[in-house]
Amino acid sequence: MVKAKKQYGQNFLIDKSVLAKIIQAIPKEMNNIIEIGPGLGDLTQELLKISQVKAYEIDNDLIPILKKKFQKELECGKFNLIHQDASEAFNPSLDEKPYFLVANLPYYVASHIILKALEDKNCLGLIVMVQREMAEKFCAKEGNSEFSSLGVLSAMICERKILFDVDPQCFNPPPKVMSAVMSLIKTKDFDELCEIENFKNFLKDCFKAPRKQLLGNLKTYKAKVLEVLSTLGLKENIRPHEICVDLYLKIYDKLKDEYGRKQRDK
């Protein structure tokens, strides 16, 4: 029996009914799937029934187990196993062809990988299992106290949905928190809307004190922000979680030269 390793945030999914629900949720036309952290290969086995699969696995001890389990699929080219940390594999894409991402993501690296995937032009969307709290952040709507930069970024380019919760007892070892499977289906790319690095820096400033007023978080640009809020008919004491994506893009549009300059001066 292989023991899960804490340093990789491993919690092996052992509930077959959860695997079935994940497979059912994958859009039918997806025929190139990337999996991150295949673990013991239980989800991989189901994915291979509907698509070719490329899997990224960081754990040395799991590579021979996966090679043995999927020897036939590896030989015929239906399965491609990459021994690499997936978070370092976006150069800039996880694959040269359009792909759909499916994963039970380690909690410590989940937000980083999801954002990288959203920025990857070849990624069509993703269905991932993450900590319930993180799924709520990615799928939150404006006005909800959970609405943050993660919610803004995902709402900009995706149709978003929390599909179902997953109890700790569905894993070995059981995590200390509730998990959830969420779906982010891309409808556009960031570069159709903004220069993403500058926009992320702008959002970082907007949400640096999420319960404070937006004007206070952007006090460096107070005069311009006041002008924009007035033009858009927004109250001066509005808070970051109360602003929708379209308005964030409009506010950023007035400040983008400042953020472009900041990026160049780094």
From Swiss-Prot:
Q: What EC number(s) does this enzyme carry?
A: 2.1.1.182
Q: What class of enzyme is it?
A: transferase
Give UniProt keywords alphabetically.
Answer: Cytoplasm, Methyltransferase, RNA-binding, rRNA processing, S-adenosyl-L-methionine, Transferase
Catalysed reaction(s) here are: adenosine(1518)/adenosine(1519) in 16S rRNA + 4 S-adenosyl-L-methionine = N(6)-dimethyladenosine(1518)/N(6)-dimethyladenosine(1519) in 16S rRNA + 4 S-adenosyl-L-homocysteine + 4 H(+)
Question: Which cysteines link up through disulfide bonds?
Answer: none
Q: Which positions bind S-adenosyl-L-methionine?
A: N11, L13, G37, E57, D85, N104
Can the keyword Signal be found in this entry's annotation? no
SMART domains in the record? rADc
Localization of this protein: Cytoplasm
Function in brief? Specifically dimethylates two adjacent adenosines (A1518 and A1519) in the loop of a conserved hairpin near the 3'-end of 16S rRNA in the 30S particle. May play a critical role in biogenesis of 30S subunits.
Tell me the protein's name.
Ribosomal RNA small subunit methyltransferase A
Which organism is the protein's source? Campylobacter jejuni (strain RM1221)
